[in-house]
Amino acid sequence: MATLLRSLALFKRNKDKPPITSGSGGAIRGIKHIIIVPIPGDSSITTRSRLLDRLVRLIGNPDVSGPKLTGALIGILSLFVESPGQLIQRITDDPDVSIRLLEVVQSDQSQSGLTFASRGTNMEDEADQYFSHDDPISSDQSRFGWFENKEISDIEVQDPEGFNMILGTILAQIWVLLAKAVTAPDTAADSELRRWIKYTQQRRVVGEFRLERKWLDVVRNRIAEDLSLRRFMVALILDIKRTPGNKPRIAEMICDIDTYIVEAGLASFILTIKFGIETMYPALGLHEFAGELSTLESLMNLYQQMGETAPYMVILENSIQNKFSAGSYPLLWSYAMGVGVELENSMGGLNFGRSYFDPAYFRLGQEMVRRSAGKVSSTLASELGITAEDARLVSEIAMHTTEDKISRAVGPRQAQVSFLHGDQSENELPRLGGKEDRRVKQSRGEARESYRETGPSRASDARAAHLPTGTPPDTDTAPESSQDPQDSRRSADALLRLQAMAGISEEQGSDTDTPTVHNDRNLLD
């Protein structure tokens, strides 16, 4: 049996191991297409700001082709470094594209104010054609859908600090798009707006340079459909992380945005580890979880073997991402989601509409959290040096805290209450029919007389005698009644008092034509 278990563990490890690269065959290269990336040909701030202005206009032009749009975005993304050309050549290793760099310098003879650097060749016409300044109609289209503030005509500046603020504002809006461009583009607008508000409050961006929605939609769609652009952005993030010492302010902002980008599309895997394993509830000892726990262990080892690109496997369209989907461990994932819903309020908005979702194990996770509330782990307590007295104190405090949390989040348990609408009277309500209606009225009258003559204790017995013998007990209240008869008697007495009071109010109001009606809308207001 021990040999079988060792073979099983070895089989699981080899099954999820990535293929080993061998030197027998050459690298597979695809059919490449050329991407032209304009970069500044000098260190002048005027050149960079003018190039940034032209590229933003170019991206806003709806007639721009896909490769040209990718080249413009790569040019903007690399503008914050001192040598954009060296950066692009160092980090670019894409089998699908061939990047050609074009140095751009200032020119007074071109309509765009820029020209391509060349040795004795006039390139103003080519520069105007690239930046779409050869046609006035195209120029007007490029201006449409630019910044939300229509008073901004251009973003050409000569101050390095001002240029960095404008460039950082534009780059922040582009980088935020990468977080959900692949995984959830339909719901990305809300999260992108929250990031924008955050960086505006931190004074990292300038609110006046908020780009228009359709400009951002164009960039988001291009990021979603172009793998080469995403490869460049991920390579740039990793290159910034490897940089030692202090980084430029824009680079630090990119690293901050990376916290929203990293592990995109891996929520099922990460949350299963967080809520299913790290919580260490005893439910992990179930036999049903044994195989899936072994699968998760193999996936965690595989994640580490992939190295620094593992958190970006979904963004990079790595085929190995399918192994990390929740379909590989459905029971443990369903259990972890139940734990997460009880522990964190933010988990309540997750979509569990999967074909492999198991409601039974989801409820198991919820019950484990509810019944384990206030309990202290003996293993962790011994490691931290927590005494038994301290553990009891912590359990007592945690129980009260959990009760307060439940009361605030869910509210008190209430019976179902029906209200009358303002346009209805008692006569207009649906009746039970002849015999049933008379039986109910007779029961109410006898209950009122019994309450007046014998008091609450005998009235409850009288009401019990009038109950139908074939009525099944309420599943929610039957266990409580069997456990505590005194509480059941008090509840019955309270119900009889309410019915008696209702009967008295009916007799007092019989002389009036219009009965008092309670409207649920008025109560809610």
UniProtKB/Swiss-Prot annotation:
GO terms for molecular function: RNA binding; structural molecule activity. InterPro entries: Paramyx_ncap. The keyword Ligase does not apply. Residues 477-505 are annotated as: Interaction with the phosphoprotein. Phosphorylation at Thr-279 is required for the formation of the nucleocapsid. GO terms for cellular component: helical viral capsid; host cell cytoplasm; host cell nucleus; ribonucleoprotein complex; viral nucleocapsid. Residues 433-452 have a biased composition (Basic and acidic residues). Residues 418-525 are annotated as: Disordered. The modification Phosphothreonine is found at T279. Keywords: Capsid protein, Helical capsid protein, Host cytoplasm, Host nucleus, Host-virus interaction, Phosphoprotein, Ribonucleoprotein, RNA-binding, Viral nucleoprotein, Virion. Residues 1-375 are annotated as: RNA packaging and organization of the helical nucleocapsid. A motif (Nuclear export signal) lies at residues 425-440. Residues 404-525 are annotated as: Ntail. A motif (Nuclear localization signal) lies at residues 70-77. RNA binds at K180, R195, Q202, Y260, N351. Residues 468-479 have a biased composition (Low complexity). Forms the helical nucleocapsid (NC) in a ratio of 1 N per 6 ribonucleotides, protecting the genome from nucleases. The nucleocapsid (NC) has a helical structure with either 12.35 or 11.64 N per turn, approximately 20 nm in diameter, with a hollow central cavity approximately 5 nm in diameter. The encapsidated genomic RNA serves as template for transcription and replication; encapsidation by N is coupled to RNA synthesis. Forms the encapsidation complex with the phosphoprotein protein P. Before encapsidation, the newly synthesized free N protein, so-called N0, is chaperoned by P. Homomultimer; forms the nucleocapsid. Binds to viral genomic RNA. N0 interacts (via Ncore) with the phosphoprotein (via N-terminus); this interaction allows P to chaperon N0 to avoid N polymerization and non-specific RNA binding before encapsidation. Interacts (via the Ntail) as N-RNA template with the phosphoprotein (via C-terminus XD); this interaction maintains the P/L complex anchored to the nucleocapsid template during the sequential transcription. Belongs to the paramyxoviruses nucleocapsid family. This is Nucleoprotein. It comes from Measles virus (strain Shanghai-191 vaccine) (MeV). The lineage of its organism: Viruses, Riboviria, Orthornavirae, Negarnaviricota, Haploviricotina.
